[in-house]
Design a protein with these regions (language model features):
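Glycine/serine-rich phosphate-binding loop and adjoining beta1-alpha1 elements at the start
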Residues: 2, 79-169, 173
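An N-terminal-biased, well-structured beta-alpha scaffold segment characteristic
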Residues: 2-112
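Active-site donor-nucleotide binding/catalytic segment of nucleotide-sugar enzymes
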Residues: 176
Length: 176
């Protein structure tokens, strides 16, 4: 069975659906993994890391869509990607089926089996497939850093021989 990872084409998206560690595990289980060249560059993962893990680097995303039985993406496929998906394949992604009804209809019409990663239960049994927790954890961390950039005061307590600066007081609203 062939697993394909095309490069994310949504503007500003730097993530990739599979890391080299996962590729290595899949190859051990006798999957063939095709990854579009430079797919991991936004996440600072070069092609050689994927090759070392056993993936084949492909220069053309169309080839990946034509050959793969399973496509792994971060974002739901855009229309041009959806057209490339072959009938009776599988798609793993943050599909957002409650927001993307037309996408769900298109996937259904092509007899594609879709797995929406953010809807996998966050339980012990499904923990290895819990992609949402890692993403919300990173988003929350980044939100704090971005918020800190807008504070006109020094964030942590600073004690030096020259004096003490009290830490900023902030209120964080939300959970993720």
């Amino acid at each position: 069975m062939i697993i394909g990872i095309p490069k994310e084409i949504l503007s500003g998206e730097n993530r990739i659906g599979i890391t080299p560690v996962t590729v290595k595990e899949l190859v051990k289980k006798e999957f063939e993994v095709l990854i579009e060249s430079n797919s991991g560059s936004g996440s600072f993962i070069d092609d050689s890391s994927y090759q070392d893990a056993g993936a084949k680097i492909v220069n053309d995303s169309k080839k990946i869509y034509q050959e793969a039985d399973i496509i792994v993406k971060v974002n739901p496929p855009l229309n041009e990607e959806l057209e490339l998906l072959k009938n009776d394949s599988m798609l793993l992604s943050f599909l957002q089926p409650t927001k993307e009804l037309e996408l769900v209809k298109s996937i259904n019409n092509k007899k594609i089996t879709g797995f929406s990663l953010h809807l996998i239960p966050r339980t012990t049994l499904a923990q290895k497939m819990d992609a949402l927790s890692s993403q919300t954890n990173i988003a929350g961390y980044r939100a704090v850093l971005m918020g800190a950039m807008h504070i006109k005061k020094y964030m942590p307590l600073l004690m030096t021989a020259a004096g003490t600066i009290k830490p900023a007081k902030v209120l964080v609203i939300g959970a993720g």
